[in-house]
Amino acid sequence: MTLVPHVIANERTYPMPKRCAIAICLDGCEPEYLDVAIAEGLMPNLKMMRETGTDRIAHSVIPSFTNPNKLSIATGRPPAVHGICGNYLFDPDTGEEVMMNDVRFLRAPTVFSRFYEAGARVAMVTAKDKLRALLSAGLKFDEGRAIAFSAERADETSVAN
């Protein structure tokens, strides 16, 4: 399959990488913690990645919860656009909190799904299983071009050829 030169996702244009691209998102910590750990020699791999790759600090979206922030990164848009406004929502019909980890709440495609639709191979790994379905929305796992799993449930994961 011939890959296109760029992908458009949610009104933003992303160039198709010429070689394998990996994005690592470290969430929930002050960037200075990482700087200190690197300076003290505690994170040599992160130090190497910063020196040889690209390192960016993103500003948090409000509310400052994992799900809205991860989906803002994955879609390139704020919660008002992608629809994941918190980790939970209150369902007035049932009177219960509902975890916002279901694709039905997602109102914008992820950048990953747009690259997949353009013919790229996509692998998505997340620490928390609650994010796996949202981050892998739009990927098809029966075509041999997409893999998604969580570290939390890695013991239940297998890939068959």
Predicted features along the sequence, with ranges:
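A residue-level signal for conserved active-site and pocket-lining positions in enzyme catalytic cores
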Residues: 27, 73, 115
